[in-house]
């Protein structure tokens, strides 16, 4: 096992906050594997790269020799996490949650070593709690303290309803740490309240409190809003290799180091070397290619990554993609047909030309030929090619934010 200092450096890489660092140092000094917990509510069937920020951190703990607990919130998933939500989330059925959980497992083991991963379901202990146990759990926290949460506070002050079961969510997540005897819990920055709940409940149940490590929410392809499937600015880990590759090669230069730090398994020394190369005049696109190849290989294999790179090279030969793509913005109130976006971005003379190019296969989005059915999602960014000479990295921004 690495020294405490070496472990701490890797643990803190890319992290937003570590609470409490001195406590974690003491735990590491014992020289025993720690129990590292991260919970995921399977509320959708597939994962994107934003979800993998936590999973990557779990892998780093795993490589350091610690015990990883991948917690599937099949019980909490039926409640729905209220964190950051302005309204009550519709609950899922147990069947939906379990179906999604199976797809999660197949995806996360592309990152985690299944032989060294403990998979747990929080229904295992939550289903065993008696009404008296639930009353005891609920008595550990007050409504006033719950309303200190920013999202609950905003909803309460704006007279929006808060269902009683939503108050249970952070209590159940916190109790998971009690049931698992977690030493460390990972979560996004939006989960801090819930993670701290775990510390408080562990104390209440006579356990040593866990340390918490919050990780930032990964920005989407637009480099502004967090990665989200609903915003369309995401890279799905089950997307076709060519699509994943083209999306990653097309990210803004300003975003690539963030992605390297949070998504790459390269050492920080190697990443610093790539930064130095870039500052010395290396083409940023060549650096992004390294990132794209690494991530495509992780989820699809080395051969698929090589094929994606080769296909992208062939596409470039057909219509050379310039190194200095112009950054273009189009304001809109809602999603927009690709023909209208090309016209407003100035990549075609008029909408009629756009329609002709689309009909003849002359329009590529992120390297892939598209037709007139392609819809540009509000808030997303794509590399657009109209014909052989018109290129641009186009972002569809809301009219409100452009004012």
Curated annotation (Swiss-Prot):
Location of the motif 'KMSKS' region: 226-230
Subcellular location: Cytoplasm
Gene3D superfamilies according to UniProt: HUPs (3.40.50.620), RNA-binding S4 domain (3.10.290.10), Tyrosyl-Transfer RNA Synthetase (1.10.240.10)
MF (Gene Ontology): ATP binding; RNA binding; tyrosine-tRNA ligase activity
EC number per UniProt: 6.1.1.1
Domain of life: Bacteria
Keywords: Aminoacyl-tRNA synthetase, ATP-binding, Cytoplasm, Ligase, Nucleotide-binding, Protein biosynthesis, RNA-binding
GO CC list: cytosol
Catalytic activity: tRNA(Tyr) + L-tyrosine + ATP = L-tyrosyl-tRNA(Tyr) + AMP + diphosphate + H(+)
Signal peptide boundaries: none
Motif 'HIGH' region positions after renumbering to this chain: 42-51
UniProt-annotated binding residues for ATP: 229
GO biological process, one term: tyrosyl-tRNA aminoacylation
InterPro entries: aa-tRNA-synth_I_CS, aa-tRNA-synth_Ic, Rossmann-like_a/b/a_fold, S4_RNA-bd, S4_RNA-bd_sf, Tyr-tRNA-ligase, Tyr-tRNA-ligase_bac-type, Tyr-tRNA-ligase_bac_2
Domain called S4 RNA-binding: residue spans: 336-396
Subunit and interaction comment: Homodimer.
Similarity-based family: Belongs to the class-I aminoacyl-tRNA synthetase family. TyrS type 2 subfamily.
Job description of the protein: Catalyzes the attachment of tyrosine to tRNA(Tyr) in a two-step reaction: tyrosine is first activated by ATP to form Tyr-AMP and then transferred to the acceptor end of tRNA(Tyr).
NCBIfam families for this protein: tyrS
The name this protein goes by in its record: Tyrosine--tRNA ligase
Originating organism: Pseudomonas syringae pv. syringae (strain B728a)
């Amino acid at each position: 096992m690495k020294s405490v200092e070496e472990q701490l450096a890797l643990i803190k890489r890319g992290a937003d906050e570590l609470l409490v660092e001195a406590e974690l140092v003491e735990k590491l000094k014992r020289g025993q594997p720690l129990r590292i917990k991260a919970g995921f509510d399977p509320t959708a069937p597939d994962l994107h790269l934003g979800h993998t920020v936590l999973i990557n951190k779990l892998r780093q703990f795993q490589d350091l020799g610690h015990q990883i607990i991948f917690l599937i919130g099949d019980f909490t998933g039926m409640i729905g996490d209220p964190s950051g939500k302005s309204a009550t989330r519709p609950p899922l059925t147990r069947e939906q949650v379990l179906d999604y959980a199976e797809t999660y497992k197949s995806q996360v083991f592309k990152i985690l070593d299944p032989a060294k991963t403990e998979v747990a379901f929080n229904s295992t202990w939550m289903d065993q709690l008696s009404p008296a146990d639930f009353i005891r759990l609920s008595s550990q926290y007050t409504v006033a303290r719950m309303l200190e949460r920013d999202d609950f506070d905003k909803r309460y002050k704006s007279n929006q309803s808060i269902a009683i079961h939503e108050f249970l969510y952070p209590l159940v997540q916190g109790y998971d740490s009690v049931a698992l005897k977690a030493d460390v819990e990972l979560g996004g920055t939006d989960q801090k309240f819930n993670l701290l709940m775990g510390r408080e409940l562990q104390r209440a149940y006579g356990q040593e409190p866990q340390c918490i490590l919050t990780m930032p929410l990964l920005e989407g392809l637009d480099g502004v809003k967090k990665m989200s499937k609903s915003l369309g600015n995401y890279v799905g880990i089950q997307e076709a290799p060519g699509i994943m590759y083209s999306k990653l090669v097309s990210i803004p230069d300003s975003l690539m180091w963030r992605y390297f730090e949070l998504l790459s398994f390269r050492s920080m020394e190697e990443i610093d070397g790539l930064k130095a190369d870039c500052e010395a005049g290396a083409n940023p696109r060549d650096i992004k290619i390294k990132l794209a190849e690494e991530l495509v290989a992780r989820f699809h294999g080395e051969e698929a990554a090589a094929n994606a790179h080769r296909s992208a090279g062939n596409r470039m030969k057909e219509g050379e993609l310039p190194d200095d793509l112009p950054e273009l913005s189009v304001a809109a109130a809602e999603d927009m047909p690709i023909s209208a976006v090309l016209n407003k971005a100035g990549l075609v003379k008029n909408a009629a030309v756009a329609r002709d190019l689309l009909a003849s296969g002359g329009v590529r989005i992120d390297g892939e030929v598209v037709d007139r059915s392609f819809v540009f999602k509000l808030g997303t960014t794509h590399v657009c090619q109209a014909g052989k000479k018109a290129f641009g990295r186009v972002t569809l921004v809301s009219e409100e934010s452009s004012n």
